[in-house]
Amino acid sequence: VWQDDDAWPNTFRQSWLIPAIEYIQADRLRRVLMEKMHVWMNGDFDAFLTPSFSDLLLTTNGTGHPALVLRTGMEGTKPHGTTLIGRLFDEGTLCRLGMAIESKLNVSNIRPTFNT
């Protein structure tokens, strides 16, 4: 059995050693970040675009802001995508924007081919 430091069982077991106070402090920090991002996003825009798998992915995983990865084209046989991040509890607007962008880019029906 693989018992390297990077093996998922060992990584998972490390979470058992997090003291409760550190967990609570991290959750409080997450809440502050969530509130700041919520205030920032309730400005003049409904959503924003970011490269797929950018550093904001970690942020939205913590804050709960919805993120939608959409197709933006193909380079040969390699698909390209972009992430659209929306306001809290506003997934409907995010989906409508994603559909409009894919439609405008004429990529909504493009699928990569797979050799089987």
Where are these regions (language model features)?
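Short, gly/Ser/Thr-rich active-site loops of penicillin-recognizing serine hydrolases
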Residues: 94-116
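Conserved acidic residues
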Residues: 46
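Short, well-structured alpha-helical segments in soluble
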Residues: 32-43
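Short hydrophobic alpha-helices that are characteristic scaffold elements of the AMP-binding
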Residues: 60-62
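A short, well-structured catalytic beta-strand-centered motif of the EAL phosphodiesterase domain
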Residues: 81-88
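Short helix-loop capping/hinge segments that flank enzyme active sites or metal/cofactor-binding pockets
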Residues: 1-34, 71, 75-81
